[in-house]
Design a protein with these regions (language model features):
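Flexible coil/turn and secondary-structure edge motifs
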Residues: 1-133
Length: 133
């Protein structure tokens, strides 16, 4: 099993979507790359995200990226739908450099690559979200 963290706006809708993607074994709502490990307090730079555990024999980072691009506006910076703010930015985060390389290759293989605002970065911090939002 492999784990990647995907940001696509409001985390609950993204989590619900990835729960239906073939090859995904488990999802969990959370926050990526904030500066604290607390859910309380002022905004600390995090992106709302979904921890996605998947079977690499049944799906890949490129396939997960293709699914993500079905539900986001990849050209939008810090905004998805009615949700506006830096925490709603789009991104893919991982502690595995291979995941980041594959995500970057997916973007670089697209004709619209220069317009894409989705960030691909190492995961530096993850905090699981509360059960209620």
């Amino acid at each position: 099993m492999e784990t990647v963290y995907i940001a696509g706006g409001c985390l609950w809708g993204v989590q619900h979507f990835f729960d239906t993607v073939p090859g995904v074994q488990m999802t969990e709502a959370g926050r990526a790359n904030g500066t604290t490990s607390s859910l309380d307090g002022p905004y600390d730079g995090y992106a709302e995200c979904v921890k996605v555990v998947y079977d690499e024999k049944n799906t890949s980072i490129s396939e997960l990226m293709a699914h993500l691009f079905e539900i986001i506006d990849p050209y939008s910076l810090n905004k998805q739908g009615v949700d506006v703010g830096k925490k709603y930015r789009t991104g893919l985060y991982s502690t595995d450099p291979r995941h980041l390389e594959e995500a970057r290759a997916f973007i670089n293989g697209r004709e619209d690559r220069d317009k894409i605002m989705l960030e691909v970065l190492p995961l530096t911090n993850y905090v699981r979200s509360a059960e209620e939002h």
